[in-house]
């Protein structure tokens, strides 16, 4: 299932990169920490494949949300 880790990261980076926003200088360390925590959680907990649908482990949702929150555009 290590290929799924790559696909999840690729999908997340594609979505985050498509909005044209990067964290400001003050939040870069926070963004790096959030991404590190998310990857560590995904490494420990395999994604769930059910009926060919890939879902994240429930205990990793908070880390994914933190990454998205760090990278969201201003004013959203």
From Swiss-Prot:
Q: How is it modified after translation?
A: cAMP-dependent phosphorylation.
Any signal peptide, and if so, which residues?
A: 1-20
The compartments listed are: Secreted
Query: What keywords tag this UniProt record?
Result: Behavior, Phosphoprotein, Secreted, Signal
Highest taxon of source: Eukaryota
Q: Which GO terms describe its cellular component?
A: extracellular region; extracellular space
Key word Transport present? no
Q: In which tissues is it expressed?
A: Lumen fluid of male accessory glands, becomes seminal fluid.
GO biological process terms, semicolon-separated = egg-laying behavior; regulation of female receptivity; sexual reproduction
- Cited function: Transferred from male to female during mating and may affect egglaying and behavior after mating.
- Any idea what this protein is called? Accessory gland-specific peptide 57Dc
- What is the species of this protein? Drosophila melanogaster
Gene coding for it: Mst57Dc
